[in-house]
C-alpha cells in the first residue's frame, strides 16, 4: 500500500462536500490503492456540524481513510496538503451585486492562498470549486507566490459533463461515443461550449446537429444549466458538482484517456490569444500528474467571438478585485 496523501477540503460541512468527502475516502479520486488523510476546513460556527460529518466518515470504515483533521484554521487544514479542493465560498445573497460577491470571496481566497503558500506541499494540486471559481482561483494563486501558478485550477468539468449529456441525449448515443468536448472560458453564463472539435463515433459533432439547435438550444442550455437546477431543486447543484470535482482531480492525478481531452480552468500561457495569467478554461490533456493545453485547434469567427466575450468577463472580474490582489 502507498503512503497516505493529504487532501484538504474547505467548506467541508457543506452540501457539495457531503457528496464529495465519502467518495474521496472510498478511493474514487486518487485510486483504490491510495490511502488519504482528509484535512477538513470550516468556519467556526460550522465545526459542530463538521464533527458530525467526521463521525459518519468514521462509521463508513473506509480502508483507505488513514486519518482526519477538522479545523477552522487554514494553516492547520493546508499543512503539508498534497491536494486541495476549495469548495467553501460566500454564496450570493439577496440584493448582492456581483462586485460585492467578488470582494467577499477575495477576502476568503486571499487567506487560503497565503496558507497554501506557507504550509502546503510544494507539489500541491489545487482545484477551486467555490464560485466565482475562475477568479477565486486567480486570487488564491496570486497570494501563493512560492507555488507554481500551474498548480491552481478552476472547475469546468461540470460544464463539460453537462455538454456531454446534452449531446448524447440529442443524438441518442452513449457517453462513450463522444470525445473531445470543449468548454472555453469562465464558469458562468458566458462560457462557450464548443462542438467544432467534438467527435461522435469519430465524426465531427457539429456536422451531426442543426445549426439552430447548436446555437440557440445547446449553448444556452449548458450555459444556464446551473440556474435551471436551482429553479427546479430550490438549491444549487451539489452531487453533480462533487462528481465533477472527483473527475477533474482523478484525471489530473492519474491521466486523461487516450485520444480524448477534458476542460479545465487553468493558468493561461497566452494560448489561442487568451491573455496570459487569467484562469481560463481550455481543452487539456493530463499525464504524469501534469496538464497541457491542447494546441493547434482551428478557431472560426463564431468561436473567436464567443471565446473573447468570456475572456472579457474574466478580465472584468479580475479588475473588480485588482485592489485586493498582491502587486
UniProtKB/Swiss-Prot annotation:
It catalyses: (S)-malate + NAD(+) = oxaloacetate + NADH + H(+). It is an enzyme of class 1 (oxidoreductase). The active site is at 187 (proton acceptor). Its EC number is 1.1.1.37. Substrate binds at residues 92, 98, 131, 162. CDD domains: MDH_chloroplast-like. It comes from the Bacteria. Keywords: NAD, Oxidoreductase, Tricarboxylic acid cycle. It holds the Pfam family Ldh_1_C. GO terms for molecular function: L-malate dehydrogenase (NAD+) activity. Catalyzes the reversible oxidation of malate to oxaloacetate. PANTHER family: MALATE DEHYDROGENASE (PTHR23382). Belongs to the LDH/MDH superfamily. MDH type 2 family. This is Malate dehydrogenase. It comes from Saccharophagus degradans (strain 2-40 / ATCC 43961 / DSM 17024).
